[in-house]
Amino acid sequence: MRIFLTGATGYIGSAVLDALLRANHQVTALVRTPQAVDALVARGVTAVLGDLKMIKSYRTAAEGFDAYIHAAADASAKREEIDRRAIDTLMTAAAARARTPSPSLIYTSGLWVLGSNAQPMDETAQTNPGQLLGWRPAHEQLVLQAASASLRTAVIRPGIVYGGNRGIVSDLLKNGTKGLIRVIGNGENHWPLIYRRDLADLYVRVATQSQGSGIYHANDECDETVNAIVEGIVNHMTMRPEVRHVPLEEGRKKLGAYADALALDQRVRAPRSRALGWSPTLHTVSSNVPRLLEEFRRGQERAA
């Protein structure tokens, strides 16, 4: 398949790119720097130098693909507007050339849009986003409602992604090596977790299977608590780090709405993803700490 990918150098997008290349798909990626262009071209990727903020930089280049994967995430104050314009641009590009089979558009959301819930939540659960991502469900619906005979659309909601040297779990590993891990709240809340290579496999399945439309959850369904994650990390440190539980109100003073996201208590199920034949290969952070520490260290060395 010919696939247009945004976020190819990001934490999720880079894993998706790896999975697409392993499956021998032809990938065109939107990247922001000449250095990224050179790195991707060396891997056989067609790179488009541009930016989500500048629609003209990629609008024409995005026309005529079999699938579009939007994995980029802007962190600026204008992230809602930038994301909305990117969705509109990719949908327009997908509709530019009629063809069979119909192209697909896969949008990256996240399980935080569900909010906290004591009962397990599957893909049919109502959204209840906090302040941090209050705009995201509307963007999900924009994508889903665009589905037609000429466009297949899907939304993937990753849980907290781990693996490599980026992301929330990697921050815990890094803090553990420095001797202090801070936990927002009492740590008894459950995090929905997913290994980044397993997440990338789901993207490939959704992109390549004709029934891949609608909402898909991406997590291991293991309901691991933050305390269990931290204890697993602590037990594999040469020098046992201190673990400090920070009250949510105190966490908000430094992290704002991000503290509330970290304190969410979520038990999540992914039946629609499993129906595609998808199954995570790694389960729980605490049972995979040695592997994750090695990945973290290798990633740090490459980044140095």
Model-predicted segments: where are they?
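NAD(P)-cofactor binding segment of oxidoreductase domains
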Residues: 57, 61-106
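Amphipathic terminal alpha-helices
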Residues: 283-304
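N-terminal Rossmann NAD(P)H-binding glycine-rich loop of SDR-like oxidoreductase domains
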Residues: 3-25
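A conserved pocket-lining segment of Rossmann-fold NAD(P)-dependent short-chain dehydrogenase/reductase
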Residues: 174-194
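Mid/C-terminal beta-alpha module of Rossmann-like enzyme folds, strongest
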Residues: 2, 202-258, 297-304
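Conserved Rossmann-fold NAD(P)-dependent oxidoreductase catalytic core, especially the SDR/UDP-sugar
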Residues: 88-132
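Conserved beta-loop-beta element that borders a ligand/cofactor-binding pocket
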Residues: 140-164
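Glycine/proline-rich active-site loop of Rossmann-fold NAD(P)-dependent oxidoreductases
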Residues: 137, 161-173, 206-216, 222
